[in-house]
C-alpha cells in the first residue's frame, strides 16, 4: 500500500477511496480532518481532496513550527488550509471549523481521525480478502497478520474481512498510543458497525481484538532508547 501513488502512498488510501465516494455523493466541496503535525492521514486526505477538486482544511495538534517540512510541507503544497489547535481539543476545533465552513457557504464533510469510520474501515475489509486471495494464488500459508494500530480502521476492517472470508488465523494490532484494555472495546464496536454496513451483520467481542501494547514507549512519535 506504500505504492498506491496518492502523495507517496500509505494505508489511508484504501479508506479514502470509500470516504471520498461518500463525500462526493453527499455533494461536499470541502473536506476537514484532524491529526498530528506530521500525520500521514492528513497528507493523504489533502492529496485526495486536490485530486478530486475539493477544498481541504486540516486541524493539527500543537502549534505551528518555525520551519515546515515533511508531510506538513506536502500539506501546504497540496493546497490544504491548516488550523493549529494549540492547547485546544482538536475534535472540538474540527467541529467548529466545519460549522465555520458551512456558515461561509461551503458544503463541509468531516473525515474522521485516521479515516476510521465504518465506511473507511470497509476499505480494509476488502483489502483483507484481496490479501488472502493473493496469498492463495501464490501458495502462501498465512495464519497471522500484524498491523500498526491507532485509530482502529485498519485492524477493524481486517477483522471483518477475515471473518467474512472464514480466515482461521489471527489479526494482531500493534498499538501505537493506547492500552489494550482501553482500545479493544472501541475496535470491536467499529468492526461490528463495519460488518453491518457491508450487509454481513456480526457482533465482534473486545476479547477477540488482539492488541499488543508493550511497545508504547514514551508515546506516539517519541524516540526512546528501544528505538535507537
Q: What is the predicted role of each segment?
A:
Residues 1-228:
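PLP-dependent amino-acid enzyme catalytic core
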Amino acid at each position: 500500500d506504500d505504492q498506491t501513488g496518492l502523495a507517496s502512498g500509505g494505508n489511508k488510501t484504501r479508506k479514502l477511496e470509500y470516504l471520498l465516494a461518500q463525500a462526493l455523493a453527499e455533494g461536499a466541496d470541502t473536506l476537514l480532518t484532524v491529526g498530528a503535525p506530521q500525520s500521514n492521514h492528513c497528507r493523504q486526505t489533502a492529496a485526495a481532496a486536490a485530486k478530486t477538486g475539493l477544498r481541504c482544511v486540516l486541524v493539527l495538534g500543537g502549534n505551528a513550527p518555525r520551519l515546515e517540512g515533511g508531510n506538513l510541507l506536502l500539506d501546504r503544497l497540496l493546497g490544504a488550509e491548516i488550523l493549529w489547535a494549540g492547547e485546544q481539543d482538536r475534535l472540538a476545533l474540527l467541529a467548529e471549523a466545519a460549522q465555520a465552513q458551512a456558515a461561509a457557504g461551503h458544503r463541509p464533510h468531516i473525515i474522521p481521525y485516521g479515516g476510521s469510520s465504518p465506511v473507511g474501515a470497509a476499505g480494509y475489509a476488502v483489502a483483507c480478502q484481496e490479501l488472502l486471495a493473493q496469498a492463495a494464488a501464490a501458495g502462501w500459508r498465512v495464519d497471522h497478520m500484524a498491523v500498526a494500530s491507532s485509530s482502529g480502521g485498519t485492524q477493524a476492517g481486517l477483522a471483518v474481512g477475515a471473518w467474512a472470508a472464514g480466515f482461521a488465523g489471527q489479526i494482531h494490532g500493534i498499538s501505537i498510543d493506547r492500552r489494550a484494555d482501553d482500545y479493544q472495546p472501541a475496535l470491536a464496536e467499529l468492526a461490528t458497525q463495519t460488518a453491518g454496513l457491508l450487509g454481513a451483520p456480526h457482533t465482534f467481542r473486545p476479547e477477540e481484538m488482539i492488541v499488543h501494547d508493550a511497545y508504547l514507549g514514551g508515546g506516539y512519535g517519541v524516540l526512546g532508547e528501544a528505538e535507537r
